Amino acid sequence: HAELKVILALLQGQTIGEQAQRLGLSQKTLYTQRLAGVKKLVECHPHLAPRFPRTLLPRSPANALTAFEQEWVQAIHDRQVFPVFQPIVDSRSQLQGVEILIRWRHRGQVLHPQTFLPHFRADYTWLLLTAFVLQEAVQNINEYPGTFYFSVNIPSSLADSDSLLRMVEAARQQLRQPEGVARLVLEYAETIDFRHQSRSAAHVAQLQRAGVRVMLDDCFSQGSVIFPARRLHFNAYKLDMSIVNDAQHDPKALALIKSLAYYCQLSDSRCVAEGVDSLAKFTQLKSLGIDRFQGYLFSPPMRREHLPDLIRRFSHQRDPADR
C-alpha cells in the first residue's frame, strides 16, 4: 500500500523531497519504496514502462540491454520514436483499417523498422515497443469513431508471452466503448512456427475469445512456415509484399494467392494484400478475389498530424482506376 502511494505520487509529478516532507519519512525510505513499487508494477503491467524514467526500471543481468537498446529505450522517453499510419482499403478505396508502423528519429536521421529491429535482443525492448504501439492503437480507437480497425504488429519473441496477454487486456480496459475491442487487430508474423509454440496458439485463441481480432502477416514470404490450419483460425491473412510482386510473372505465386483467397472465402476470413503500388497489381489481385489492399497506390505511411485527413480521404468510395 505504501509503495502504491509513492508510485501514484511519482506519476502525478511529485518529487521525492516533496513526498518526504508531506509524509514525514526519510528520502531513503521513499526511494526504496519507489524502486520496489516500479519493479512490481512493470512486471505485472509492462505497458506502463514508458511512464517511468529508465533509471527506475528493473534490470535483469541475464537479459541486459545492449547499448543500442538503451538508446532505443531513452528515445521512447524522449519522444524520438513516433508512429506512422498506412490505410487498408477495399476495392472501392473505402477505409477498412489502419496499420500502425514506427519510425525512430536517431542522430539526425529517421530510421525505418528494418534498420533497427534486427538489433533488438532483450524481451524488455520488445515489450516496450509493443506497449508503445498498443497505446497508440487505443488512443486512436477512442479518438476516431467508425468501424475501421487499427492493427499492431506482434514480435515473434512475444507470441507465447503472458506479458502480451496482460498488455492487451490493459489496452482493452482503456477503451471507452467495450465494443471498440473489435477494432483492435494484432498481426502475427507467419514466420512463427505455431506447431512448436503451443502456447502461442493458445494465446491467439484466448485473445480472440476476448474479442480481439488476429491476423496472420507475411503469408508466403521467403521465410514462410506451415501454420496449423486445422488448429488455428485467424480472422484475416495478409499476403507478403514479395509474393504480390512475384505474382506479376510467376504462375506458382499466382496459384498460391488464389488458393489463400479461396480459403478465406470458405472460412469467413479476410485476405489482405500489402505492397500494392500499381494499378496493374491492384487489378490482378482484385480478379483473384482479394478485397483488401494496402500499399503506395493508395497512400504511403503518414505521420499522426495527417491521420484525420487520411481517414476523411478514404471515407468516400471510389475505384482506384477512376483517379
Regions found by a protein language model. Name each.
Residues 61-179, 262:
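Bacterial c-di-GMP phosphodiesterase EAL domain
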Residues 38-67:
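Basic, Lys/Arg-enriched C-terminal extension of HTH/homeodomain DNA-binding domains
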Residues 30, 103, 107-108, 156-160, ...:
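EAL-family c-di-GMP phosphodiesterase catalytic domain
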Residues 165-170, 198-202, 251-258:
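Charged helix-capping and loop-helix junction motifs
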Residues 2, 33, 45-46, 256:
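N-terminal positioning helix adjacent to the helix-turn-helix/winged-helix DNA-binding module
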